[in-house]
Amino acid sequence: WMMEFTEKMIEKICLDVNGTTQVKVGDNIIDFKAPYKRVTMLDSIKEHTGYDLTGMNEEQIREVCQKLNMEIDDTMGKGKLIDEIFGEFCEGTYIQPTFITDYPKEMSPLTKIHRSNPDLTERFELMVNGKELCNA
């Protein structure tokens, strides 16, 4: 319900302030009309890198990072590696409002475990114009 609440709230604010759901930001026209697209984090990574990290362990993800020519170090665990991949290859591509969902539990250890997959969490971030707008 929180994603629905968030998108409806933002849509209403845009309408009340601007009289439209569309906002020009630089060269982009952002349309805040609900509903917003929803993409899982791992699907986003697969779409933008070609690598499916589902079920991979830390060492396998480390190998993917090396294949992607990323700068990583030994202090980075599984969650940090996934976060780095997403940040470098995916985050900046979301111009229109998009909820990124189903974060790996290693990235959010204090977040509620996903209702159907214990390796994921019930978390989302709203990406707009290549940036994180909110996180819940």
Model-derived features with residue positions:
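Catalytic palm subdomain of template-directed nucleic-acid polymerases
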Residues: W1-E4
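Metal-assisted phosphate- and nucleotidyl-transfer catalytic regions
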Residues: M9-K131
